[in-house]
C-alpha cells in the first residue's frame, strides 16, 4: 500500500519552531537551554534541542526501512537540522542552525539565538492566517468543523469550489480533517468532488511560487493537515483521495454518493483504491469502481449513439469522408467489443502532404483519451533512417549510453499502453525499424532494451506515408473530372433533379493493381503489409472543400485581427474564389494557407506598418476586377481571365457605411534590389 508514503507519525518540526518562538522560556533566563516549551496545539513537551533538531525516531516519514530525512537505515542516530533540511536537504552543523552556539552540549549564545528566533518569527508573520475574504474564511471554517459558519459564508456568496493559494479546496480540507458534516454541506452547495489538488510537494510548490520551502510547509500543515509527507507529491489528488488517506469510511461514502469518481487518478497515476487500507473502505471502493465503470460504459455508449465519431471528426477535418468513415468503422468495432483482443488496430494513411492525415490521427486520439498528452504518441520516422538509430526506438542495449533512459516508444507505451501511436512518414524509416514493427503489430507487445516486455494489444497504431501519393492524386482528379462531366451531360439532357456530387470512390482494381505493387516494392515484405488492418486513402480537395479551407483561414486571421489589433475584418464572397486558385495538389491545405498569407496578410501587415489602420476600424477585402463573372467557373478559366488576373484590395468602412480603398505603398522586393560594389 502507498499509505505509508504519504503519512507521518507525529507532529512535524514547523510546529516545534512556532512553539519555540511563542514559549515564555525565551523571555526568562535569556532562553535557557533546559527549559521545556509547549509545541503547537498537541501539547508535546520538547526541549530546545528538539526544537532545533529533528530525529528520525521522533518525526519519521513512514518509508519502510528508512530514516526521516536522511534516507538512512532504520535505527541510525543521524540528526539533521530541520530548517536546512526543509530548504535544501543539506545537514549543516549545529553552529549553522543556531548562531552563536559553540557546541552541541554547550549553552547557546543569547544574541545568536535571539536573531534566529526573530528570523523564524518573520517567516510565520509572512503566512499570517487571518482570512482576508470569504473564500479564505470558508477554508478555515471547513478545517475547524464549524458547520454554521460554513453555511453562513456560502449564503453570503463564498465560492464553494474556490482554491487556496497553494491549490486545495474546502472540500479537500474537510475530507482530510474528518469533518463529515462540513462535507455534506459543501456537497449540497455544489462542490465538485472530482477537482484535483494543485499542490504537488513542498519543495516543488515553493520553487514554482518563488517562496521559501519552510513557508509553504508551515502553511500546508496549518491550513490543511500536519500528517502528510511533505516530500510526496499530491498534485491531482481529489477529496476522495484525501478521505481514503484519512481512512474515514463515512466521508468516503458521502463523496461517492455525491458523484466522486473512484477511478480518477492523480498526477502519479494512482486511484483512491491504491491508498486504501484493508477493511471497509477498500471493500466500498472496489464495489464503487465496478458500479461506476458500468455506468460510465452505458453513458459513453449513449453518447456515441447521439453523437457518432464520424460527426465529431468532420467538425475538425474538411473533406475526406471516405477516410473518416473507414477509421470510424474500425474504432466502433473496438469500442463495442467486436474486435480481436489479441492484436492491435493498425492503419496506413496514404496521400499527399497537407491533406489531413496527421490531423485525423490527432482527433482520433483526442476522442479515445481524455488526456491527449499521454494518449497520443507521435514519432517522426525520419529520425530513424540509420541502422544505429533503431536503439532510440526501443532503448539501448546493456553497456551502451542511454540504456537506463529507455526507448522513445517503449517509455511512453509503459505510461499509456492503450495510446494512439502515430508513425509519421514511415516510408523514411530504416528496414530494421520495420522488423521491430512486425512483432508490435502481430503480437501487440514489444521488448525494450532492458529485456522487459510491454503489452500494448489495446493500442491503435497509425502510419502515414507519401508513397504513391502522385498516383492517388492523379487518379482522384481524373475520377472527379469524369463525375463532373457526367453530371453536366445529364443536366444538359434536362434532368433537373440531378445534383453535382464531389464524392468519388477509389476502385478495388486501382488499389490492387496500382497501389499495392508500389507499396510492396517500397517496403519489400508482404508480411508487413499483411499486418495492416486498413489502408486509408486521402484524396485531393474538391472546389467546395477548397472554399471551406479559404474561409477557415480567413476566419482565423479575422479573429487574430480582432484580438490583437481590435480590427474587424470582412470579405466579399468572390475573395474565396480568387484565393482558391493558389491551391497546389502536392501541398494540400498548406498551399491555401500560404496563398492567404501572401495575398491578404501581407497587405494587412503593410497597411498596419504604414499607420493606415486606425484602432477599432472595419476592413473589407474586395476583388478589384471589372468582370467578376470570370470567377464563376474556376475549373475552366477563360484566356481573358488569365490575362487579367483579379487582385485583392483592402478598404475601410466608415461609420456612415462609406468605403474608401487604402493606398498601400508596395514594399521593396529583395529580388529587385541592385547592389553596387
From Swiss-Prot:
Transit peptide: 1-57
Record localization: Mitochondrion intermembrane space
Pfam families for the chain: AAA_2, Ank_2, ClpB_D2-small
Region (Autoinhibitory) location: 92-126
Region of interest (Regulatory), residue spans: 477-505
Site (Cleavage): 126-127
The record's note on its domains: The ankyrin-repeat region is necessary for ATP-dependent protein disaggregase activity. It plays an important role in stabilizing the substrate-bound homododecamer by mediating contacts between the two homohexamers.
Assembly behavior: Homododecamer when substrate-bound; the homododecamer consists of 2 homohexamers stacked head-to-head via ANK repeat-mediated interactions. The active substrate-bound form is likely to exist in a dynamic equilibrium between homohexamers and homododecamers. Homotetradecamer in the unbound state which is remodeled upon substrate binding into the homododecamer. Interacts with PHB and PHB2. Interacts with MAVS; the interaction is enhanced by Sendai virus infection.
Record's protein name: Mitochondrial disaggregase
Naturally occurring in which organism (per UniProt): Rattus norvegicus (Rat)
Amino acid at each position: 500500500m502507498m499509505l505509508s508514503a504519504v503519512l507521518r507519525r507525529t507532529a512535524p518540526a514547523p510546529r516545534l519552531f512556532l512553539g519555540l518562538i511563542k514559549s515564555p522560556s525565551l523571555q526568562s533566563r535569556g532562553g535557557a537551554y533546559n527549559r521545556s516549551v509547549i509545541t503547537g496545539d498537541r501539547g508535546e513537551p520538547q526541549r530546545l534541542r528538539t526544537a532545533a533538531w529533528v530525529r528520525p525516531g521522533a518525526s519519521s516519514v513512514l518509508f519502510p526501512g528508512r530514516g526521516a530525512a536522511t534516507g538512512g537505515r532504520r535505527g541510525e542516530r543521524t540528526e539533521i537540522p530541520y530548517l536546512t533540511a526543509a530548504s535544501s536537504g543539506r545537514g549543516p552543523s549545529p553552529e549553522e542552525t543556531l548562531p552563536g552556539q559553540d557546541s552541541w552540549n554547550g549553552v547557546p549564545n543569547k544574541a545568536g539565538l535571539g536573531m534566529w528566533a526573530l528570523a523564524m518569527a518573520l517567516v510565520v508573520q509572512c503566512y499570517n492566517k487571518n482570512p482576508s475574504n470569504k473564500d479564505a474564511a470558508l477554508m478555515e471554517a471547513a478545517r475547524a468543523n464549524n458547520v454554521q459558519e460554513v453555511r453562513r459564508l456560502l449564503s453570503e456568496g463564498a465560492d464553494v469550489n474556490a482554491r487556496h493559494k497553494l491549490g486545495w479546496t474546502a472540500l479537500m480540507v474537510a475530507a482530510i480533517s474528518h469533518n463529515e458534516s462540513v462535507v455534506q454541506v459543501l456537497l449540497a452547495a455544489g462542490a465538485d468532488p472530482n477537482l484535483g489538488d494543485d499542490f504537488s510537494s513542498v519543495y516543488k510548490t515553493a520553487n514554482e511560487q518563488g517562496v521559501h520551502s519552510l513557508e509553504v510547509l508551515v502553511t500546508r500543515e496549518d491550513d490543511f493537515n500536519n500528517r502528510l509527507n511533505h516530500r510526496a507529491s499530491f498534485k491531482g489528488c481529489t477529496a476522495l483521495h484525501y478521505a481514503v488517506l484519512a481512512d474515514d469510511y463515512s466521508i468516503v461514502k458521502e463523496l461517492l454518493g455525491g458523484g466522486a469518481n473512484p477511478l480518477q487518478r492523480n498526477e502519479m497515476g494512482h486511484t483512491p483504491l491504491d491508498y486504501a487500507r484493508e477493511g471497509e473502505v477498500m471493500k466500498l471502493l472496489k464495489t464503487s469502481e465496478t458500479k461506476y465503470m458500468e455506468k460510465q460504459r452505458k453513458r459513453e455508449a449513449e453518447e456515441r449513439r447521439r453523437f457518432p465519431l464520424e460527426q465529431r471528426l468532420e467538425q475538425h477535418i474538411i473533406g475526406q469522408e471516405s477516410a473518416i468513415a473507414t477509421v470510424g468503422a474500425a474504432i466502433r468495432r473496438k469500442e463495442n467489443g467486436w474486435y480481436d483482443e489479441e492484436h492491435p488496430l493498425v492503419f496506413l494513411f496514404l496521400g499527399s502532404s497537407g491533406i489531413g492525415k496527421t490531423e485525423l490521427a490527432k482527433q482520433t486520439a483526442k476522442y479515445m483519451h481524455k488526456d491527449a498528452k499521454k494518449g497520443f504518441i507521435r514519432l517522426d520516422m525520419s529520425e530513424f533512417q540509420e541502422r544505429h538509430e533503431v536503439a532510440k526506438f526501443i532503448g539501448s542495449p546493456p553497456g551502451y549510453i542511454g540504456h537506463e533512459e529507455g526507448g522513445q516508444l517503449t517509455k511512453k507505451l509503459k505510461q499509456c499502453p492503450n495510446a494512439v501511436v502515430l508513425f509519421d512518414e514511415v516510408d523514411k524509416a530504416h528496414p530494421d525499424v520495420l522488423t521491430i514493427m512486425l512483432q508490435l503489430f502481430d503480437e501487440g507487445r514489444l521488448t525494450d532494451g532492458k529485456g522487459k516486455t510491454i503489452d500494448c494489444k489495446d493500442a491503435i497504431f497509425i502510419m502515414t506515408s507519401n508513397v504513391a501519393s502522385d498516383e492517388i492524386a492523379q487518379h482522384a482528379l481524373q475520377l472527379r473530372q469524369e463525375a463532373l462531366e457526367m453530371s453536366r451531360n445529364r443536366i444538359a439532357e434536362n434532368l433537373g433533379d440531378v445534383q453535382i456530387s464531389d464524392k468519388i470512390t477509389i476502385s478495388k482494381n486501382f488499389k490492387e493493381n496500382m497501389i499495392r505493387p508500389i507499396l510492396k516494392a517500397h517496403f519489400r515484405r508482404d508480411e508487413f503489409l499483411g499486418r495492416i488492418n486498413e489502408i486509408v486513402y486521402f484524396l485531393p480537395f474538391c472546389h467546395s472543400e477548397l472554399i471551406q479551407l479559404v474561409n477557415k483561414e480567413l476566419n482565423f486571421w479575422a479573429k487574430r485581427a480582432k484580438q490583437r489589433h481590435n480590427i474587424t475584418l470582412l470579405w466579399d464572397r468572390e475573395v474565396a474564389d480568387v484565393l482558391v486558385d493558389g491551391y497546389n495538389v502536392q501541398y494540400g491545405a498548406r498551399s491555401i494557407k500560404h496563398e492567404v498569407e501572401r495575398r491578404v496578410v501581407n497587405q494587412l501587415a503593410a497597411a498596419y506598418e504604414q499607420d493606415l489602420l486606425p484602432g477599432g476600424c472595419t476592413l473589407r477585402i474586395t476583388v478589384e476586377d471589372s468582370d467578376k463573372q470570370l470567377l464563376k467557373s474556376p475549373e475552366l478559366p477563360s484566356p481573358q481571365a488569365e490575362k487579367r488576373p483579379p487582385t485583392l484590395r483592402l478598404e475601410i468602412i466608415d461609420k456612415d457605411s462609406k468605403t474608401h480603398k487604402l493606398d498601400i505603398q508596395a514594399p521593396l522586393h529583395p529580388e529587385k534590389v541592385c547592389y553596387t560594389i
